Amino acid sequence: MTTAGIRAAVTGAVISAGIALSPMLLTACGGTGITGSGTAATQTRHLDAFSGVDLAASCNVTIQVGGRPSVVVRADDNLLRHVKTQARAGTLTIWTTGSFTTNSPMSVQISTPSLQALSLSGSGAITAGNIQAQRLTVTLSGSGVVRASGTVTHLDVSLGGSGEAQLGQLAARDVHAILKGSGRIVTRATDTLQASVPGSGTIIYSGHPAHVTTRITGSGTVTRQ
């Protein structure tokens, strides 16, 4: 093969590799993409009503229950467009696009009249306060943290991964908790607790429930606080 042929082959290989990697780069959050400007900005999003929040991004989300629906995004001014929010079928979904590095804290502040479901995947954080609901469902996968306070009748919480569900400030009559990973669930039940631990994590409960049922099939534990 001639020198020109070798150069063409190498160039083609590099281009092909770049094409193969591009979807991975586009979906990454952090790395060698866009760098945040360092100038913090806020943007208010006007969305349909919702009672569930699904976070699939590495950012901090604060939810205040009560009042009209409101979503305010805070980030570097050149990164706001990379924070996506969509309300559909009663659930607000938050995610990011592109590869970027932040220089200002990225967060989303939410107000909603009611809250019935929280879902977090990845390494983000959700803090929800003043919850008043008949039933609340909390689903967590990954290494993130969910914190909630208020009062509910029924609480269903499922955790897979190494994250934490800090729900000790959420007074619940009946709690059904499943811990599939190495994380930790802290909860409070006043009547009934059903705790299942097929993983290696820990469920810690308070509230002196009259009826406690535990099922441990892994190396995890269920402990009274």
Q: Which residue ranges define each predicted feature?
A:
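Short acidic/polar N-terminal linker immediately downstream of export determinants
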Residues: 2-80, 91-111, 220-225
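Extended, compositionally simple hydrophobic/Ser/Thr-rich segments
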Residues: 43-44, 51-63, 100-225
